[in-house]
Amino acid sequence: MSVGIVQEQSVTFDTELRLESGRILGPITLAYETYGELNADRSNAILVAHAWTGNAHLAGKNSEEDTKPGWWDAIVGPGRLLDTDRCFVICSNVIGSCYGSTGPASINPKTGKRYNLTFPVITVRDMVRAQALLLDHLGIDRLLTVLGGSMGGMQALEWATQFPDRIRSAIALATTSRPSPQAISLNAVARWAIFNDPTWKKGEYRKNPKDGLALARGIGHITFLSDESMWQKFGRRFNARDGLFDFFGQFEVERYLSYNGYNFVDRFDTNSFLYLAKALDLYDTAWGYESLEEAFSRVKAPIQFFAFTSDWLYPPYQTEEMATILRSLGKPVEYHLIESAYGHDAFLLEHETFAPMVREFLDKVERSE
């Protein structure tokens, strides 16, 4: 059952946030949505962390006119995996993004102009520190769980290591403790596509650059899929409207990348795309520690990991490595490898497969106290 119509909320914090870079950001606005009701002892709160280009609109619709529900609608609502009859679910837009939270497209109160490239470089850890301010605002001392895939999984890891006393569990899907050189190189090529678009104007554009961002998003879509899913979805089919020997004729997979790339331009700010890509590349759970083992020694809550066989962006061995280290430290951890052809996007699509395991995990967490 759907959660129905949901209104986005926002809160502005006048306090300044000291970032990992040493720079100061403030005031900070966070956009967020909530689903369900917070119980009397405030023990049923779940934070869902979104991925790179996601937003706070996790489930339901913001108006009757919306044609699509939130990005993970299938798992949120009465009787669903995140049962809103039992849980209070929160999803906030990360700082650096462009869906209502403070980012490069926001107005710098000191200048009265958009930040653009004067916006400071942010990290996933900075995002989580801002989320902690939101929990304080909502009067929530401790989360039942924090759950997320991809960059959302990185946020879950940061909660587990940086705020170990504020969570009872963490669930991380299709994620990594640090992106590989291959993942960084793909983001680098996406950046070049934007940097070489003359309409980007070194971040001082008035109208969102079109071609550079569309190409960058197309590169991203390739990493979200897999060889098997591309065969299943497109094969070698040629666009029926194009002639086979038309020089500019397209295979269906080309048309898909073009369509999704240019649609993305209408919904996402280019500078935000660049800043969040940088945050992904910089991510390292062990940042500030001698090793990943030292970082994970701070973990107190059980962590449940999910990896997907065809995910080549953050392949399963990277998740398994984290689970192995946590196990060696005597930390409560689960690692599940799910057979899937969907590639990195499997964390959004395989919910029927992982839902029973998540339910069992959360039931154990709730019974533990």
UniProtKB/Swiss-Prot annotation:
Decide whether keyword Lipoprotein is in the record. no
Give a Gene Ontology cellular component term annotated to this protein. Answer: cytoplasm
Coiled-coil residue windows: none
- The membrane-spanning stretches of this chain are none
Q: Which reaction does it catalyse?
A: L-homoserine + acetyl-CoA = O-acetyl-L-homoserine + CoA
Top-rank lineage group of the source organism: Bacteria
Molecular function (Gene Ontology), one example? homoserine O-acetyltransferase activity
Keyword Cytoplasm in record: yes
Question: Which GO biological process annotations does it have?
Answer: homoserine metabolic process; methionine biosynthetic process
Q: Where does substrate bind?
A: R217, D345
- Which keywords are on file for this protein? Acyltransferase, Amino-acid biosynthesis, Cytoplasm, Methionine biosynthesis, Transferase
Pfam families recorded for this chain?
A: Abhydrolase_1
In this protein, the active site sits at S150 (nucleophile), D311, H344
Which ranges carry the AB hydrolase-1 domain? 44-350
Its quaternary organisation is: Homodimer.
Question: Which HAMAP family has this protein been placed in?
Answer: MetX_acyltransf
In the record, the note on similarity to other proteins reads:
Belongs to the AB hydrolase superfamily. MetX family.
Known function: Transfers an acetyl group from acetyl-CoA to L-homoserine, forming acetyl-L-homoserine.
PANTHER family per record: HOMOSERINE O-ACETYLTRANSFERASE (PTHR32268:SF11)
Write down what this protein is called. Answer: Homoserine O-acetyltransferase
Instruction: Write the lineage as a comma-separated list.
Output: Bacteria, Pseudomonadati, Thermodesulfobacteriota, Desulfuromonadia, Geobacterales
**Per UniProt, what is the name of the gene that codes for the protein in this document?**
metXA
